[in-house]
């Protein structure tokens, strides 16, 4: 017989007391980032009940089981409300996997190394932007790995979405109607590059002459023919009170146009339920939202490590559920020992269709694992949940340079009020020879300038 030092409800009581007292530090048995700094493993910060789904459910669920409508109520407290409804009423399933202990499998290596090296150096300046001593921009990694406030948590993800200095994601998008059929199917490319806080691309940590910018980001569509060549470029100022400059190329006009940049709750293409505002749950400048509050803490189920389908030559994923068996990606989830739930409200938009958003973050990495937005009446409206992975499986491996690539693998963006679903997956390549790449300086010239938009539109 094994005697447990902490009973099953110890963690629940701890999280409730911490929230009531406004104590925001992560970890139950010890400060989380002290445990990570010691060994690269967060396990010492949590009791056994938070380190396995079998322990949490007292043996009623175990690794390898499927969560279905028949047993989802056992883990209802671990799921955001829209995902629960998808399982309960729409045939969604989740496969359970062991909890990942090694923190290096949950973020890019260089990003994590910079987080540890620069821990404690970040501060907000008088305008609320993240700086180091001397007032210069952030120098790399997560500025607030042991965040104490909601705005620190959101500042971290807004500052660096994909956690690489540069990335190009080859994407397949599928937009489904309420009847469960794919109504639109797009091949798309999404590029990101950071001019500041660089951790592996020279020059580091800043790209000279661009220290006033936070990121370059673009999206273009390579198929079908009706959308081919349509492309958009966002250039983000470092100042988080300012909207990005948004440029677009529409083949019918054969020229670059500047678009209104505050219309971030509208789809870029027909059929999609995905908005610019949704990107990484933080697609808008930090101070165009406000009233950031930590409103919940506790364990969660999330797809943080098993999303890559190495067995498919193009990394494509299988689907299930919904009226036609096409609505949901096959998804593997695991028990996250501690998630932090943050609420925020749009303040910089005159006609935002949402009144607030709730975002769940893995406390170990401050990675957003799910989001639910609410309409102006306060009813659930839209959900965004992603799956992540280290791109290493058996003998299969995709590298970001010296280390296996870490990134998102697939996403659901679901409108619960209409029943429409957008599914995205990161694949190896798309139409036109565009292939997923990471930390490649050529990404800028190929995808992140107005000249690049023209070339993509005419290519």
Cite the ranges covered by each PLM segment.
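N-terminal secretory signal peptides
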Residues: 1-38
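Flexible, processing/modification-adjacent segments and terminal tails
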Residues: 137-186, 238-243, 249-337, 442-459
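Extended beta-strand-rich segments in extracellular/periplasmic secretory proteins, especially
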Residues: 107-110, 115, 119-120, 189-210, ...
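C-terminal soluble interaction/assembly domains
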Residues: 350-426
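A generic structural motif
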Residues: 220-224, 247-251, 345-347, 374, ...
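Short glycine/serine/proline-enriched coil/turn segments at secondary-structure junctions
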Residues: 226-227, 239-240, 334, 349-353, ...
